[in-house]
Amino acid sequence: MESQQLSNYPHISHGSACASVTSKEVHTNQDPLDVSASKIQEYDKASTKANSQQTTTPASSAVPENPHHASPQPASVPPPQNGPYPQQCMMTQNQANPSGWSFYGHPSMIPYTPYQMSPMYFPPGPQSQFPQYPSSVGTPLSTPSPESGNTFTDSSSADSDMTSTKKYVRPPPMLTSPNDFPNWVKTYIKFLQNSNLGGIIPTVNGKPVRQITDDELTFLYNTFQIFAPSQFLPTWVKDILSVDYTDIMKILSKSIEKMQSDTQEANDIVTLANLQYNGSTPADAFETKVTNIIDRLNNNGIHINNKVACQLIMRGLSGEYKFLRYTRHRHLNMTVAELFLDIHAIYEEQQGSRNSKPNYRRNPSDEKNDSRSYTNTTKPKVIARNPQKTNNSKSKTARAHNVSTSNNSPSTDNDSISKSTTEPIQLNNKHDLHLGQKLTESTVNHTNHSDDELPGHLLLDSGASRTLIRSAHHIHSASSNPDINVVDAQKRNIPINAIGDLQFHFQDNTKTSIKVLHTPNIAYDLLSLNELAAVDITACFTKNVLERSDGTVLAPIVKYGDFYWVSKKYLLPSNISVPTINNVHTSESTRKYPYPFIHRMLAHANAQTIRYSLKNNTITYFNESDVDWSSAIDYQCPDCLIGKSTKHRHIKGSRLKYQNSYEPFQYLHTDIFGPVHNLPKSAPSYFISFTDETTKFRWVYPLHDRREDSILDVFTTILAFIKNQFQASVLVIQMDRGSEYTNRTLHKFLEKNGITPCYTTTADSRAHGVAERLNRTLLDDCRTQLQCSGLPNHLWFSAIEFSTIVRNSLASPKSKKSARQHAGLAGLDISTLLPFGQPVIVNDHNPNSKIHPRGIPGYALHPSRNSYGYIIYLPSLKKTVDTTNYVILQGKESRLDQFNYDALTFDEDLNRLTASYQSFIASNEIQQSDDLNIESDHDFQSDIELHPEQPRNVLSKAVSPTDSTPPSTHTEDSKRVSKTNIRAPREVDPNISESNILPSKKRSSTPQISNIESTGSGGMHKLNVPLLAPMSQSNTHESSHASKSKDFRHSDSYSENETNHTNVPISSTGGTNNKTVPQISDQETEKRIIHRSPSIDASPPENNSSHNIVPIKTPTTVSEQNTEESIIADLPLPDLPPESPTEFPDPFKELPPINSRQTNSSLGGIGDSNAYTTINSKKRSLEDNETEIKVSRDTWNTKNMRSLEPPRSKKRIHLIAAVKAVKSIKPIRTTLRYDEAITYNKDIKEKEKYIQAYHKEVNQLLKMKTWDTDRYYDRKEIDPKRVINSMFIFNRKRDGTHKARFVARGDIQHPDTYDPGMQSNTVHHYALMTSLSLALDNNYYITQLDISSAYLYADIKEELYIRPPPHLGMNDKLIRLKKSLYGLKQSGANWYETIKSYLIKQCGMEEVRGWSCVFKNSQVTICLFVDDMILFSKDLNANKKIITTLKKQYDTKIINLGESDNEIQYDILGLEIKYQRGKYMKLGMENSLTEKIPKLNVPLNPKGRKLSAPGQPGLYIDQQELELEEDDYKMKVHEMQKLIGLASYVGYKFRFDLLYYINTLAQHILFPSKQVLDMTYELIQFIWNTRDKQLIWHKSKPVKPTNKLVVISDASYGNQPYYKSQIGNIYLLNGKVIGGKSTKASLTCTSTTEAEIHAISESVPLLNNLSHLVQELNKKPITKGLLTDSKSTISIIISNNEEKFRNRFFGTKAMRLRDEVSGNHLHVCYIETKKNIADVMTKPLPIKTFKLLTNKWIH
């Protein structure tokens, strides 16, 4: 087994290989039977001695004290071959036979019988396991054989003497398996030796010492039969017995030969593992010896590959050959032959050197003293270069290496003083004779460090810029200087202890000194020629002397080997002691690793597991003593507390305690986890785990689904892996009773492979504890890793895989070993591991240009399974790569800075661990960028700061306006230290379609307002708070002014009333410090709440009647009327008649009674929003009753009657389950297939048009060289997954033209044929509406373009094949694609990158950050939607210039140039637009709806009356279960999909007033009850009735040159199922409605205020994104407003009183809203509920109210 490990695991290190070989004890003596006690059970070597004084009888016997003693006893049990011998064949008490082993028989009593038959024994005793023989018959072994006489050899005599007194011999054990026969034979031979039969056993040469007698043969035959049953004999033994059933001697002879062969193999392995070579013997002899051993092992089936052989050879090299271990150890593909070429070269060079230097002989003490220990470090070797080559020898690089990584033998301290004998050294150069002296080595105070070093000398290095020395005895004026950065030739750091002076006293009494650095981590003392040159000393290699510039000789140079040396006798020793210099600076290698760093490095494992792993060497590279465990006891990891939070510990011992014992990898546990929701399609949603019962080794595999074929693929993979890697067969797999395990496909697979499935019993979760606990552990680790690193959630499986790698390497406290050790694998080298999410820079091997940056920021995930690289996530490329070309980003611990880790810095620790893996960027070459803005992956995305805020002190407590108390004392806010972090990209919640892309500023402290009354939404009570609350306290350009100006003029930086105030620091954003706010009075505090507006003029107030605004009454209040009017002016709000002040009744008095079904309401319900409709009138008008008109189902049913059929099975559909199952609305197929358009088309005219369109498309494909026309491929030659199905689709466009398109079936495209990270971007609808609105306000020309066959301009990178078009008639052939065909997954992304590059480089455009497909320059704005382009410009010639540039590359059609001054009609992305420049714009879809709705087969106008509203209040969807036939259910679901799909298209384009009804019905697509269908028909009927309505825009006429962006928000509390609230927002730009949103809140709100806060917080991110877009497209200043009808929400936003926060989530949401309002300069305004047009987005309204809120913008 040990020898097999060398071949099965070639990656095991030297130490592991040596340990696996030497663990087997092998003796080299000639006796083949002298086997180790580790393999043979220990028998009583003194045998069982009978007491000569003791007499026993069969009836009674004394029980001996020695348990090996035995006494006879009658027995009645069957012979031993019929059952196992208990207790290792020890005879039980009272079974001893006084006559020894005589019962084995005599030839006269037991005839020879065939071996296969049971021998005839005497009747056995009543309790004996052996036949009972007469006691008078003596043992044939008691006397010498007459044939042998006294002719025994000495060895046999010794055996005979040793066993002559053995009256009772312990029998061998029973043979129970053919595999155990070799070991059993050894014990059987030992048994024969103890029975005085050692002479008949064959010796090494195969011949016995003496002949065997008949009695001995009988004894041999019978004992062999008894203890080796025939059914357990190997085949080769049976073959021998089939020829001669008595030839036991031949069996023994063959067995001994096999033992000798095994011994030779073991000896060869031991010899190979303990090779030693230093050049004392010829290299040829050494090579012959090694190759013979390797050939012998290979011939015996023990394969020694090149890697293992080279490692073992290099491990034994010493002397001048030792450096091969350091120059060759990184060569992965080196062969034994190449290694021996290097050995031969050194040997020949050594021999030549000895011949040229006959008088020199190296001092043997050099090698004796070459035993030193060094600190454990990973610093690499130091390269020293000589400046000049000699005439007859090559100048080599000095083989100086880092001793800390190469020499692990015990030794003295680095600076210990040892004496060495002086020795004459003959100089190699003839010029040395001119010195007139004989060079002798002085007594040196330094121990030798390397075999090829010249003791007592300094190596002259022309490449070293600094002098380095290991000994402390020559350093003068030593001082600590740890900041010095010294690197070796590979640019790796060398730790420096101290810096000082090195003083020389040369032979001409010249004294000089140079700077020297002290370090014990080098192999040679290096003397820098550069530093000598600085003091006017040069090295002359022609004379081999050090000399001055005037020619004065200072010291001789000695050439030893290939290097030049100067003696240390010229150095002046210092008086500093060794401990002093060693304590000057602690070496980096001696500093212990902090426990928090190791805890994070090892996947947040606990301290006990880590210590066990280090003690048992399952984690290599450093020891337990290298870690600082002082903080491990009370250390609490915040990430662990968050990620591993659990209720209680799992019950221990839940697995079955009486399972059978299995060999490694025979019994597996498996379980599936998932799904993980809200992930990209490319990310796995599940994982399946496997755990081995014996070794606890774990595997995890990702899954995208739980289909049978996916599970079967994983099972096939792991079974093949275990079989090939571990030579084991899985016997049992334990799993739960999930359908993925109990399906027929998997069951047949397991049955075919002979695997027993072991299912858990019903409701017995404890029986599956191994797999469940593993999944829980991995998920804990996953959450912790993601929390700590801040990486997006779609990388969750990478965290699982990282945890699995680490967990397999951690030791179990029970077994003291890791799973890898149990499996026979090497330990995990922690130096190859990086913390999960560690920021790195990856080398870009294929940059876009020569000046493009070569580094890409990324985040390390886990080591690669398939290479020596690391898996790294690159956010900018949106993919992961497997590479070794990376460098760790210094000073970036990902998100560690978010928690208080006691200011730990792990950079140095990480550098020490990964020093050998720093690949291509030196630390001094890394430049950090301050620009952390990363281009968004989504339309709207931001990095939302999640840092917990420090507690803030209130600046001043506000008092009532009439209070005249002096201003309160201000308290300082805690100062924040800004720290720039490279943050991992955060995921955007898929439930939120808009989020901020701009960095938001921190909220600054604001004054607190007292005496605030809080009311519900649409409040009925008077509120003494400012209803206009801009929270935008500027953090920049603030200054104090002496004059007290009361006007605020528009400017980027505005002034305030600030004079004679004490400045108090407040927290700032973006790292800005020392920002102050003035100390203000209470009255001024209230004023500033209204006046802090950066962009709105204000004037003194005149009245307070406008728009029911209730301002705060202060003496010097600047009027907020103009400010508020600038927000609300020009908004399409309803006009209400003025009402006289009346006292409102109790708001709860007029509410309708609570309906028990209101919580299930989808289209209506109670709410405060309808209260005002019932106050003045208790009767509903006739117009209100019109909404009760229902579409008759009878008309529709008569068209769809089916003939009578047998009863069918019905399906039950539950409302809540159906609502939850709805994910998205499937698009309606509006195209025709080839057979529909041409083959079976009965309309001849239409068919001809489609045929023409078909040929036109084919010609275009050929023109664009879409595929390779030079070769057609056979289908059998191509990988099926690279073959893409294709088809022709046909369509009739709205202008009447017929279109054909050749497309690929991307819906069934294999994932390996495209990059899932690539995205096909199109212009967002909000971006288009914003551009259209700005075009109207700025008199822009609008030009519409179309690029024909746009996708075909983009090349395709992947190797893909399609079937030729049908007209070619080549169904069995394939053609290779060259262009991005429509329908391919990557075509959209390829085209986007192509056109984007062209617009930027050739047209001079730039893409707006955060808004894909929106490009601009100083004159033109372009909105791109696939092949459609919309150009906006004030100068039509600028548009024409862009068109000319586009036509140079693409087939560009001008759909509408837009040059007319009259009304121009456009059809832009489905919108029918009427535009008259400088006047108005109308957006509708009348023509499209007139064409599409009749095709839906919906009965229109059944009663001849028009609906005036899409729904009615108070109507609830019945939640009773729906029971339908399967076919009927599918048909109705399909119909719902078509109807809601069309309604959604219309609603999100321009009919924002219908979004509430569309959103509600979309949730019931899978619940097509009669009621739901009727409501859907009503909605379609209303769309049909109002198809001529348009979204009307008029050109705004602002008083000031600003853009005004406003969002109106509303929420309906608890009117959805499960008490969810409906929220809605409407966005307006310069008074024009550009978008709307209606959705169900993702959380359950507990109050109306909380629902309103949730609605506002949902609207702010998109508002900020639109603000950024408007500022990019139009450089005018922008004012942002937020309107709501909830006074309580406004009071929370403007207040600093955190006591209003009822719970943590509510408070967090409100606090975040405060920050967003403050940081984004939002003006919060109150709007009456009657005027809140967002009310239509949250609830069904009566006809009158619906019309009142919509007639100003939809008509």
UniProtKB/Swiss-Prot annotation:
Misc. remarks from the entry: Retrotransposons are mobile genetic entities that are able to replicate via an RNA intermediate and a reverse transcription step. In contrast to retroviruses, retrotransposons are non-infectious, lack an envelope and remain intracellular. Ty1 retrotransposons belong to the copia elements (pseudoviridae).
Comment block on domains: The C-terminal RNA-binding region of CA is sufficient for all its nucleocapsid-like chaperone activities.
Primary residence: cytoplasm
Active-site residues per Swiss-Prot or TrEMBL entry: 461 (for protease activity)
Residues binding Mg(2+) 2, per UniProt: 1346, 1427-1428
Molecular function GO terms recorded: aspartic-type endopeptidase activity; ATP binding; DNA binding; DNA-directed DNA polymerase activity; RNA binding; RNA-directed DNA polymerase activity; RNA-DNA hybrid ribonuclease activity; zinc ion binding
Ranges of Polar residues composition bias in the record: 1-10, 48-60, 127-152, 1005-1015, 1054-1082, 1101-1111
Annotated positions binding Mg(2+) 1: 671, 736
The protein, known as: Transposon Ty1-MR2 Gag-Pol polyprotein
List of residues binding Mg(2+) 3: 1610, 1652, 1685
Sequence ranges assigned to domain Reverse transcriptase Ty1/copia-type in this UniProt record: 1338-1476
Keyword vocabulary terms for this entry: Aspartyl protease, ATP-binding, Cytoplasm, DNA integration, DNA recombination, DNA-binding, DNA-directed DNA polymerase, Endonuclease, Hydrolase, Magnesium, Metal-binding, Multifunctional enzyme, Nuclease, Nucleotide-binding, Nucleotidyltransferase, Nucleus, Phosphoprotein, Protease, RNA-binding, RNA-directed DNA polymerase, Transferase, Transposable element, Transposition, Viral release from host cell, Virion maturation, Zinc, Zinc-finger
Composition-biased stretches (Basic and acidic residues): 1038-1053
Quaternary state and interactors: The capsid protein forms a homotrimer, from which the VLPs are assembled. The protease is a homodimer, whose active site consists of two apposed aspartic acid residues.
BP GO terms, sorted: DNA integration; DNA recombination; proteolysis; transposition; viral translational frameshifting
Location of the region described as Integrase-type zinc finger-like in the Swiss-Prot/TrEMBL record: 583-640
Subcellular compartments: Cytoplasm; Nucleus
Post-translational modification remark: Initially, virus-like particles (VLPs) are composed of the structural unprocessed proteins Gag and Gag-Pol, and also contain the host initiator methionine tRNA (tRNA(i)-Met) which serves as a primer for minus-strand DNA synthesis, and a dimer of genomic Ty RNA. Processing of the polyproteins occurs within the particle and proceeds by an ordered pathway, called maturation. First, the protease (PR) is released by autocatalytic cleavage of the Gag-Pol polyprotein yielding capsid protein p45 and a Pol-p154 precursor protein.
Organism, scientific name: Saccharomyces cerevisiae (strain ATCC 204508 / S288c) (Baker's yeast)
Domain Integrase catalytic, residue spans: 660-835
Described purpose of this protein according to its UniProt entry: Capsid protein (CA) is the structural component of the virus-like particle (VLP), forming the shell that encapsulates the retrotransposons dimeric RNA genome. The particles are assembled from trimer-clustered units and there are holes in the capsid shells that allow for the diffusion of macromolecules. CA also has nucleocapsid-like chaperone activity, promoting primer tRNA(i)-Met annealing to the multipartite primer-binding site (PBS), dimerization of Ty1 RNA and initiation of reverse transcription.
Residues the record lists as Phosphoserine modifications: 416
